[in-house]
Amino acid sequence: MNKTAIKNFAIWARNKLIADIQYRAGLMGITAEGIKNALPQSTPNMEFYDIGTAEPYSITGEAIQQRKKLVEILRQKEKDSDYATAYKYILEEVAYTWFNRLIAIRFMEVNDYLPSHIRVLSSETGKVEPDLVTTPFDTELDFTPAEEENILRLKTNNALDELFRLLFIKQCNALNEILPALFEKTNDYTELLLNLSVVDQDGVVYHLIHDIDENDFNIEKGGQVEIIGWLYQYYNTEPKNAAFAKNGKITKDEIPAVTQLFTPDWIVRYMVQNSLGRLFIDKRKNEGVFADGRGLDEMTWDEAEEKRITAEKHLAEQMEWKYYLPEAAQTKEVREQLDKIQQQSEYKDVRDIKVIDPCMGSGHILVYAFDVLMQMYEDAGYNQRDAAKSILENNLYGLDIDDRAYQLAYFAVMMKARQYNRRILNGETTCQVYAIQESNNINRTHLKYLGAGMDDLEVNTARVQVEGLLDTLRDAKEYGSILKVESYNWELLRRFVSAADAGDQVTLDSAGLEVTVAQLLTLIDIAETIAQKYDVVVTNPPYMAISNGDARLNEYVKKNYPDSKADLFAVFI
């Protein structure tokens, strides 16, 4: 893997995407200085904007509504800070949205994981235009008659870039069915500001295809899904440097860029093999007699300890865990204590093991933990297809405060599952990784519409617990996985929230109830993941002096983690 090429592309691509998005927004009167009104000659069906040329720039139809949505979001963000911050936020948000989708689709097309098996960004035969542009109607994409007519018109006019953007958005929205956490239905303004080209040799698509060796994405040729994590880390290089350079307090929004560091592969393997792998080896080494046929009661203590170590080494070699370290020889007293601990953590069924990375970043540790779990399942007699599904449903968990990193961790884990199970991307199975969300904007007025049909005792209990949960998750992105969450009745809370009924008439009070229900169900999933116990916790924790955080983080850590209040890494330990 050529990490220099990956780094150079990711840093350059971020700046290029932001510049292109800024240009698109500027055409419609939205700049760093402010938001311009449409020119007087505008009509409800066509708006004109002065861009300093003889002819004004015009937008029509759906684009008018998309621009209105963009302005609405900017004004909302402006209230929370100022216009300059809101404008920068939009540029960064749209840029990372399309960057994440570009690199994900590149990985999928190279490994032939796309449902249509037709390349979206490149061509199997090396043409300039992607195969999707050449044969759009050979895909499984569902086009309306109007879209079909528009595609034919654009092909006739050789408007390749416009045609590509139309098809690329269509493909992203279609992938929502199988990878909803990454390919969310695009916001109106996200589509409006998309400015990708397949013809321009100085464009992001061209550089992605030509600057990074295709084999770095190709699993069959030594590529790894971990390339997604490296791309994301390098994408954040300049924001990270800027946060450090300002010499001030690190804000909530800056914590991810400042603290994320992609963990090298050998360190990941070392940590997972000596935690999750140790569970397996502890179980196996105690299941039978040793190689010479004698039981422990027939050996001297030194012989028994030597045999334990030999057995561990042998099992690790069988599993090809070269970073596994056998336990050192112990005295009888220490061994008895260790055996008690091991007996407490010994699992009866591989499906019962719970593994979490509480600050998962882009998922490197989770991806390798998936491989080790797969080995354990195969040893227990499972086939790979069933094992992959069970790992997603029962074993693997992840959390992070960064929405962008979460999307890529989710993608990486799902691609790892796809490696073992061709049918896993059917939309029926997803992974239990989450971006921690805050409760700050939950409309608590809607709680009175929840619990329809449930008895009063359950409703009252659930409402109290939901209120407590919302209080706990206020400003949750400030604290992340170090939050202390009570172990609520999760099944009750899910029933309570799902039983929403505001009647037939939508009122000012009940407007937006469906959104609140979806948000609450997500918060319940996140809170349960934080609250529950795990057999294995593996992570590369964030490294940041607490004194560099803001007052809320300082106060929370001092109150809840007084013995490790100096640095975030110590808090996680």
Where are these regions (language model features)?
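SAM-dependent methyltransferase catalytic region
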Residues: 249-253, 257-573
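Non-catalytic, mostly N-terminal accessory regions of nucleic-acid modification and defense proteins
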Residues: 1-292, 296, 414-433, 438
